[in-house]
Regions:
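A residue-level marker of the well-folded mature domains of exported/periplasmic proteins
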Residues: 3-5, 26, 30-352
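C-terminal motif of bacterial Sec signal peptides marking the signal peptidase cleavage site
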Residues: 18-23
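Core hydrophobic alpha-helical transmembrane segments of single-pass membrane proteins
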Residues: 13-17
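Bacterial N-terminal signal peptides that target proteins for export
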Residues: 1-12
Length: 352
């Protein structure tokens, strides 16, 4: 869940994304380091991964980034150094994190989340021979790969699914933090719902606002928000809220006939959510792992990607998960909606 914004050295980003950290293997450091996985022999590619709040283990966005780096390390040999942010981080903290990785010889370095955009803009200039990748923002520099996604398109399909599955003509959307990136998820979802059935009521709630990024890493807040919507009559709830969405899924699982829609990863198949999987209708999968892997591979191959690389619905950058078979009966309608988006017949909004 994140905003794409063109930034120059004078620009500033506004938010952080939720993530959580665990792994196997390992190197670590004092800069809020999480354990890091390693693959292959010493002397291989050295991958630096800078997570935002939470890091590896969020069962969502950051875990998807981790899968991409893990795959690359295993395939090409080498190691991964992972550093994770805190909710109290300043811009200087993010800059220091990237600088530490670059000074230690990690190349490429992946910054996970748009809050790193100003830091990448600055540090990439200081280390012109190091290749940087940033997820969910655009930084204009010759040594930066901007990895973006059309979240609104995938969320539109989630809205279609919600509209076709609700029994009460009442659904909900939970956003982690009230920032432009998450507004893309909301906009696509609401449009998908109303294009399918304009009579359906959509409840919307954001868990935090402004510079308070706790909404991306507070499962208790997600659970409370979802429970409020369920009590108010909603029976399908889509969350774009990092690990806070795990709490929403838990709440939905306690209500017979209600559905949760996951985000970023195929949450039906996440071990930590296994006991709730029969309440997960689908997930709006954002293939961050593909973008991260493609970037690392390009550096390994000596042809580093740079500039804007957008992963759209047409390129399978976003999609709806089919695990569990709960949307099999509506798949033809979802496929039809997808084709209309890909062909340009449907223009999906990026703001509510």
């Amino acid at each position: 869940m994140r905003r794409v914004a063109k930034l120059s050295a004078a620009c500033a980003a506004t938010a952080a994304l939720a993530l959580t950290a665990t792994a196997c293997g390992s190197t670590s450091s004092d800069n809020n380091a999480s354990p890091s996985s390693s693959g292959g022999a010493k002397g291989g590619i050295k991958i630096g991964l800078a997570y935002d709040v939470g890091g590896r283990g969020d069962r969502s966005f950051n875990d998807s980034a981790a899968r991409g780096s893990d795959k690359a390390a295993k395939e090409f040999g080498g190691s991964i150094k992972e550093l994770t942010a805190k909710t109290s981080d300043t811009e200087a903290d993010r800059e220091q994190r990237l600088s530490d990785l670059a000074q230690a010889g990690y190349n490429p370095i992946v910054a996970v989340g748009f809050s790193y955009a100003p830091a990448v803009t600055k540090i990439a200039k200081q280390f012109p021979k190091t290749n940087f990748g940033i997820v969910d923002s655009v930084v204009n520099a010759s040594n930066v790969d901007s990895i973006t996604f059309t979240e609104e398109q995938g969320s539109y399909l989630a809205g279609v699914a919600a509209a076709l599955k609700t029994k009460k003509d009442h659904v909900g959307f939970i956003g982690g933090v009230d920032v432009p990136l998450i507004k893309k998820f909301e906009a696509g979802y609401v449009q998908g719902v109303h294009d399918t059935n304009p009579k359906i009521k959509v409840d919307t709630q954001y868990l935090s606002h402004g510079s308070d990024f706790s909404g991306f890493a507070s499962p208790d807040k997600g659970k409370a928000a979802a429970q409020g919507m369920l009590d108010n009559g909603a029976d399908v709830i889509y969350s774009a809220a990092g690990s806070s969405g795990n709490g929403a899924i838990e709440a939905v699982s306690g209500t017979k006939g209600a559905w949760a829609i996951g985000v970023d990863s195929d949450q039906y198949n996440i071990p930590g959510l296994a006991k709730y999987k029969n309440s997960i209708l689908t997930s709006m999968v954002k293939n961050v792992d593909v973008g991260v892997y493609d970037f690392i591979k390009s550096v390994h191959d000596g042809k580093p990607l740079a500039g804007l690389n957008a992963y759209s619905l047409a390129k399978n950058g976003v999609s709806l998960a089919t695990s569990g078979g709960f949307i099999n009966d509506i798949q033809p309608k979802l496929d039809a909606a997808k084709q209309k988006i890909v062909s340009g017949q449907i223009k999906v909004k990026t703001t509510p």
